[in-house]
C-alpha cells in the first residue's frame, strides 16, 4: 500500500509542471521569427536562445516520457513486489505448516521405530519360546513312546501269564478228574477185595488207615493249592498296580497341554479343535480305562476262586492188598494164577505207566516266557510266577506230571509214615 501511495504522489507532482511547460511551448517566440526582421543582431541571440529552449523542451519532453515510463515501470515493480510479498507470506505459512507436518511425521517415525524395536524383541522371545516348546514336544513324544513300549511289554507279560494260568488250570482240572476216576476204580477194587477177603480184618484196618492218610494228603495238597492261588492273585494285582494308571493319565494331560500351547503359538486351528474334542472326551476315556482295570482284577479274582475247585494232586503210590488164595473160594484160585503178586505198596499201573520226559521245564509247552519290564519292589521282586525260592515257607506253583517239584515237610513225613506202617504190616 505504501508503494501505491508513492506512485500517486509522484504523478500528482509532475502533472502541474508538465502543463506549465506545455503552455510555455505554445507561447514560444519561434512563431514570430519571420515577422521580427528589425532587430537582426538581437534576433540571432534570441534564435540561439530559442534553439536552446527548443533543445531543452525536447530534452524535457524526453525526460518526462522517460519519467512516465519509469513511473509505469515503478508501478509495475511495486505491484510485482506486493505480489511477491503476498506470495512470500503464503510461502511462509506453507513452510510453517510443512514444518509442523514434518515434526509430526518425525514423532510418528520415532514411535514406529520404538514399536518396531519392541516387536522385534517380542519376536525373538517368541522364537526362543517356540524352540523350547518344540524341544519339550520332542522330549514328551519320546517319553510317551517309551511308556507305550513299557505298557505293551506289560500287556504281553500279563497275557502270557493269563494264558499259562489257564493252561495250568485246564491241565490240573484234567488231572483231578483222572485222579477222581482212579480213586473210584480203587474204591471199587477195595470194595471187591473187602468182599473177597472179609475175614482178614487186620488188612481192612490197614486199608482204612491208608485211605485216611491218603485223604489227609489230599487235604494238604488242597491247602497248598489255595495258598498258591492266593499268591498268584497277589502277584497279578501287584502287576496291575504297577501299571500306575494315574501317572499315565498325568503324562497324557501334560502332553495335551503342551500340544494346545504349541498350537496356540503357531495358530493351528485344526489342531486346537481336535485337542479340544479330546479334552472334552477325557472323562469318558478315564472311565473306560478304570472300568477295564476293574474288570481285569475281577476276572483274575474269579479265576483264582475257580482254580480252588480244581486242585492239583501229586502222583501218590496207591495201596493194594496182597491177595492170598482162599481154599473155600474156587473162583479165586483161577484168578490168582493169572494175576501177579503185588506188594502192598507197589504203584498202580495207571499211575506208574507215565514216563518222565527228558526235557522237563517249569513252564507248559507252547507258553512263551518274556522278560518282565516292571520295576522290582521290596515285597514282590523276589517272588516268581513259575517257581518259589523258599519251598518251606510257601508252596510252589503246580507243574505238569514228570516235572520236578517241591513238597512240604509235613507231606513228606506223612508219606514216610505210610511206608513204615506198610512195612510193619
Swiss-Prot record:
Location of Phosphoserine modifications: 343, 394
Coiled-coil region: 68-197
One MF term in the entry's GO annotations: RNA binding
Subcellular location: Endoplasmic reticulum membrane
Keyword list, A-Z: Coiled coil, Endoplasmic reticulum, Membrane, mRNA transport, Phosphoprotein, RNA-binding, Transport
S-S pairs: none
Major localization listed first in the record, in broad terms: endoplasmic reticulum
Membrane topology value: Peripheral membrane protein
Presence of the UniProt keyword Transmembrane helix in the record: no
Residue spans of biased composition, Low complexity class: 326-338
Keyword DNA repair listed: no
GO CC list: endoplasmic reticulum membrane
Region (Disordered): 24-45, 322-425
Biased composition range(s): Polar residues: 35-45, 345-358, 382-397
A Gene Ontology BP annotation from the UniProt entry: endoplasmic reticulum inheritance
Pfam families: SHE3
UniProt function note: RNA-binding protein that binds specific mRNAs including the ASH1 mRNA, coding for a repressor of the HO endonuclease. Part of the mRNA localization machinery that restricts accumulation of certain proteins to the bud and in the daughter cell. Required for the delivery of cortical endoplasmic reticulum into the emerging bud.
Family note: Belongs to the SHE3 family.
Protein name: SWI5-dependent HO expression protein 3
Species this chain originates from: Saccharomyces cerevisiae (strain YJM789)
Lineage per the UniProt record: Eukaryota, Fungi, Dikarya, Ascomycota, Saccharomycotina
Amino acid at each position: 500500500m505504501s508503494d501505491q501511495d508513492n506512485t500517486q504522489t509522484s504523478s500528482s507532482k509532475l502533472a502541474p509542471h508538465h502543463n506549465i511547460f506545455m503552455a510555455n511551448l505554445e507561447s514560444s517566440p519561434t512563431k514570430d521569427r519571420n515577422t521580427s526582421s528589425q532587430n537582426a543582431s538581437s534576433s540571432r541571440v534570441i534564435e540561439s536562445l530559442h534553439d536552446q529552449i527548443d533543445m531543452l523542451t525536447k530534452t524535457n519532453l524526453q525526460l518526462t516520457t522517460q519519467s512516465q515510463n519509469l513511473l509505469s515501470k515503478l508501478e509495475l515493480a511495486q505491484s510485482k513486489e506486493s505480489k511477491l510479498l503476498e506470495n512470500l507470506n503464503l510461502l511462509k505459512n506453507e513452510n510453517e505448516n510443512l514444518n509442523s507436518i514434518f515434526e509430526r511425521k518425525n514423532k510418528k517415525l520415532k514411535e514406529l521405530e520404538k514399536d518396531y524395536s519392541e516387536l522385534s524383541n517380542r519376536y525373538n522371545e517368541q522364537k526362543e519360546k517356540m524352540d523350547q516348546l518344540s524341544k519339550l514336544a520332542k522330549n514328551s513324544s519320546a517319553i510317551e513312546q517309551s511308556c507305550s513300549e513299557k505298557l505293551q511289554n506289560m500287556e504281553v507279560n500279563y497275557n502270557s501269564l493269563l494264558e499259562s494260568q489257564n493252561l495250568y488250570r485246564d491241565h490240573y482240572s484234567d488231572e483231578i478228574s483222572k485222579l477222581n476216576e482212579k480213586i473210584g476204580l480203587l474204591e471199587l477194587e477195595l470194595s471187591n477185595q473187602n468182599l473177597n477177603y472179609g475175614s482178614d480184618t487186620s488188612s481192612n484196618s490197614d486199608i482204612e488207615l491208608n485211605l485216611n492218610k491218603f485223604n489227609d494228603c489230599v487235604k494238604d495238597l488242597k491247602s497248598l493249592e489255595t495258598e498258591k492261588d492266593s499268591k498268584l492273585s497277589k502277584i497279578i494285582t501287584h502287576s496291575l498296580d504297577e501299571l500306575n494308571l494315574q501317572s499315565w493319565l498325568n503324562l497324557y494331560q501334560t502332553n495335551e497341554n503342551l500340544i494346545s500351547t504349541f498350537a496356540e503359538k503357531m495358530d493351528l486351528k485344526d489342531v486346537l479343535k481336535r485337542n479340544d474334542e479330546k479334552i472334552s472326551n477325557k472323562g469318558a476315556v478315564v472311565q473306560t480305562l478304570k472300568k477295564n482295570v476293574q474288570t481285569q482284577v475281577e476276572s483274575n479274582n474269579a479265576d483264582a476262586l475257580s482254580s480252588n475247585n480244581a486242585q492239583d494232586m501229586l502222583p501218590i503210590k496207591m495201596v493194594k492188598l496182597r491177595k492170598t488164595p482162599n481154599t473155600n473160594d474156587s473162583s479165586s484160585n483161577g484168578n490168582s494164577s493169572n494175576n501177579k503178586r503185588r506188594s502192598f505198596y507197589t504203584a498202580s499201573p495207571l499211575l506208574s505207566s507215565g514216563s518222565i520226559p527228558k526235557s522237563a521245564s517249569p513252564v507248559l509247552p507252547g507258553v512263551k516266557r518274556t522278560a518282565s519290564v516292571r520295576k522290582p519292589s521290596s515285597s514282590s521282586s523276589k517272588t516268581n510266577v513259575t517257581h518259589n525260592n523258599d519251598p518251606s515257607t510257601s508252596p510252589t506253583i503246580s507243574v505238569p506230571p514228570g516235572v520236578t517239584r517241591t513238597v512240604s515237610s509235613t507231606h513228606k513225613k506223612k508219606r514216610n509214615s505210610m511206608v513204615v506202617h506198610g512195612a510193619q504190616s
